[in-house]
Design a protein with these regions (language model features):
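Short loop-beta-helix segment that forms the pyridoxal 5′-phosphate
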Residues: 155-162, 556-560
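Active-site histidine-anchored catalytic micro-motif
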Residues: 171
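Internal active-site segments that recognize and position negatively charged phosphoryl groups
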Residues: 174, 573
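Conserved "HGTGT" condensation-loop signature of ketosynthase/thiolase-family condensing enzymes
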Residues: 1-156, 177-180, 196, 201-225, ...
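A short, small-residue-rich loop immediately preceding and capping a beta-strand
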Residues: 157-163, 185-191, 585-591, 727-732
Length: 750
């Protein structure tokens, strides 16, 4: 394993928001005391007057200024603006198409990871209005990201994760983890959220939107304003950057991720999850007793968030908080959702480069409520900043923080990455065992709940969860929680062990019923309409949020979405998280609910089959071998390895090649793939023929005669584990990617 604890660096930082499309441009505007929260014509919907002749509210938000695309001329702004930021970052890091191809031929392993709150939701709105299949097909995040990466020379895809508004910082942590695991050499961490009616209406119906200027940490703060943002970073080892002549903008010193396990839309008042994330991120400063020279707070200007965040900062720094300058950038650019942490980190890097820290707008901290807060206001503050932190908090209690050091500093300090002690105590990659499994799928031959759809009987879920807590939840959320409960029961975990678990949830479609209900209502009745519960249950990280809330998870939790292989991707990210020592155990869930519109779209796209669609969920408890041994647990199986492969080009041939590589990454005695009757099954068959003989063993498809999205691969993994044999589960995605899991049952000798 190549060492990375001695240094990970950022060699590019591109950002785009309402104040500009370069970090130095954004900073310059902030230093001139500019804000850019005004009319937002890019929001698709309109307000409807409550009565004839009644005034209609103005749509005010912070969108990226309209301009002609330089690259990536595609159907919608997400792909267009994301492509521009990606190309900007690659140019800054001296990574043109030819250079990337040369480095790949020399063995450099590139990966891209994406973070977002709402992904391709704008395409869903367009499709609901125009009925065009092209619009609806672009809804999945894998399609958005593939388009944005076109022409770069990089593989056309990457896992899309969501920790709601903590996605930007979480994406950087995932990128760094891939390098710590020595499974990649250069990561592009991308975070984005286009301005959208779905987000605007959602925050409006939750009554979180301010009518006036944003006033963070003040006594009269009244709410947030929606923004739009894109942030792209290049992450690599310090030694690799030096060898290729790249200039480090900053060094990553640490990061932290946690969960409140408190409430879906309100932070824990004591800020406990955020405090844990901040403490973990800033551990590198502890030996020298230094403090960050600047903190970019999450600071949404909502009463509950600002109070909870102050509690977290106070818990993390104590009385020394008064010596830490804090800024609140959303007061100038709105809340850019999944891109917030990334855009704000890019601005912080510009501030470090220019030795000028931007102040919050419209704000002087309420001294009575926030007595130790040094909030920058009424002008920028000059001075060298060598260490800075960014804090991000999201729906469902997702908390994340990151600490960076200036690229040029006279007195660098050693980084302290999560799991550093565990990595230092072992020279070998630790075995990851499966200690628990929960499966919820309909029985074969069950009566359909709708034409072509199979569902679980309600009694399959009865008694597993708090009936009152789940009564109004989306079916998807109930499935995630129930499967997770079954898995931890099977693993024999106590409450304390469960709280310490990380959580990773994979899904292709999430909660389509509530999502479609909310969207159709706002299209019909205007931006002021919408059920707040339906909005909250529609965000892409709802699975991991409900897993945390339902089971009480307090470590990192996030969702992976938009692909058939999302369950495999969740297992893959969890394995890396465990093998780098960041946590002792993790709960991984794949879940899907059914909906007739989803079935119709898949059929019209040629991705469906005559097999019925089924709802369901599968959950695993993954543990480091040392953790399982220390608590006296019993292994049910082993996650030997995992792989996620993205194609170099589009088309069926590229999909087949991705799957061939995924199979080769985990070659074993048997390979299991999708049902033969499906498009994915046919791609699997082509890949198996292309792969050639595997030697001893068999190859075949999942025997259950139904389709269930991201649940299928994990259901196959559960079958292999329970058989006591060893095998590879290999699955293609319609966007061209492929994933594999190598599973070994406890009775297997191979």
């Amino acid at each position: 394993v190549r060492a990375a604890d001695d240094g990970l660096v950022l060699t590019a930082a591109a950002a785009s928001c309402s104040l500009g499309e370069h970090r130095s441009e954004i900073l310059a505007a902030m230093l001139e005391d500019q804000t850019a929260i005004d009319e937002a014509p890019a929001i698709e919907g309109v307000f409807v007057a409550e009565s004839p002749g009644a005034p209609v509210p103005m749509i005010r938000a912070a969108q990226v200024p309209e301009s002609e695309p330089k690259v990536g001329a595609v159907a919608d702004r997400a792909e267009k603006l994301l492509s521009r930021s990606i190309h900007q970052a690659l140019a800054e890091a001296s990574l043109d198409h030819q250079t990337i191809e040369r480095m790949q031929s020399e063995g450099t392993r590139f990966e891209t990871v994406f973070g977002t709150t709402l992904g391709g939701m704008r395409h869903l709105g367009a499709g609901l209005r125009n009925g065009r299949l092209e619009s609806l097909s672009r809804t999945t995040t894998a399609t958005v990201t593939r388009t944005a990466l076109a022409g770069t020379g990089l593989p056309l895809g990457g896992s899309t994760v969501s920790a709601a508004c903590a996605s930007g910082v979480s994406t950087l942590a995932i990128a760094a983890t891939a390098i710590l695991a020595d499974e990649a050499d250069l990561l592009m961490a991308v975070s984005y959220d286009p301005i959208s009616e779905f987000a605007f209406a959602g925050f409006t119906c939750l009554r979180l939107v301010s009518e006036g200027p944003l006033r963070p940490f003040t006594a009269d703060r009244a709410g947030m304003r929606l923004g739009e943002g894109y942030g792209v970073f290049i992450v690599e080892r310090a030694g690799d950057a030096q060898a290729r002549g790249a200039r480090p903008l900053a060094r990553i010193l640490g990061w932290g991720g946690a969960s409140d396990a408190h409430h879906l839309t309100q932070p824990a008042p004591d800020g406990r999850g955020a405090a844990r994330a901040i403490r973990e991120a800033t551990r590198a400063l502890e030996p020298s007793q230094r403090l960050p020279g600047l903190i970019a707070a999450h600071a949404t200007s909502t009463p509950a968030n600002d109070a909870a965040e102050y509690s977290a900062l106070s818990a993390a720094f104590g009385g020394r908080l008064r010596d830490v300058p804090v800024t609140a950038l959303k007061s100038r650019i709105g809340h850019t959702l999944g891109a917030a942490g990334a855009v704000e980190l890019a601005v912080v890097l510009a501030a470090m480069e220019q030795s000028k820290s931007p102040a919050a707008a419209n704000a002087e901290a309420d001294g009575e409520s926030f007595p130790d807060l040094d909030l920058l206001h009424e002008g920028s503050r000059a001075g060298c900043v060598e260490h800075a932190a960014v804090v991000s908090l999201g729906f469902g209690g997702a908390d994340a923080a990151i600490l960076v050091e200036a690229g040029e500093t006279s007195d660098p300090i050693p980084p302290h990455f999560p799991g550093q002690a565990a990595r230092a105590s072992s020279t070998q990659r630790e075995t990851i065992l499966i200690s628990g499994c929960g499966v919820l799928v309909p029985e074969v031959g069950k009566t359909p709940v709708r034409v072509g759809e199979l569902g679980l009987d309600d009694d399959a879920l009865d008694g597993l969860d708090d009936a009152r807590a789940v009564r109004r939840l989306a079916r998807f959320s109930r499935l995630v929680r129930a499967a997770g409960i079954l898995a931890v029961q099977d693993a024999g975990l106590d409450d304390q062990e469960i709280r310490a678990c990380a959580g990773f949830v994979g899904t292709r479609f999430g909660a389509p019923e509530y999502t479609l209900d909310f969207y159709q209502e706002l299209i019909r009745d205007g931006l002021g309409a919408g059920n707040p519960l339906h909005f909250a249950e529609s965000v892409p990280n709802i699975g991991s949020a409900q897993l945390s809330l339902g089971l009480g998870l307090e470590a990192l939790t996030l969702s992976v979405g938009g692909t058939v292989i999302a369950g495999i991707e969740a297992m893959h990210l969890a394995r890396r998280h465990l093998q780098t020592g960041q946590v002792d155990r993790a709960i991984v869930v794949a879940a899907e609910e059914t909906h007739p519109m989803v079935r119709k779209i898949l059929h019209d796209l040629g991705h469906g089959s005559e097999l019925p669609n089924t709802e369901g969920a599968v959950a695993f408890v993954l543990e480091r071998e040392s953790s399982l041994r220390d608590r006296g647990g019993v292994a049910k199986g082993e996650l030997v390895d995992s792989a996620v492969i993205w194609p170099a080009s589009g088309g069926t041939h590229a999909s087949v090649e991705s799957l061939v590589r995924a199979i080769s990454e985990g070659a074993a005695q048997s390979v299991v793939g999708p049902p033969a009757e499906t498009l994915a099954g046919r791609v699997f068959g082509l890949a198996m023929r292309r792969r050639g003989p595997l030697g001893v063993g068999t190859r075949g498809s999942l025997s259950r005669p139904f389709e269930n999205g991201s649940v299928g691969p994990l259901l196959a993994a559960a079958d292999v584990m329970r058989s006591g044999q060893a095998g590879v589960i290999a699955w293609p995605d319609s966007a061209g990617g492929a994933g594999s899991l190598k599973i070994r049952g406890v009775s297997s000798e191979s």
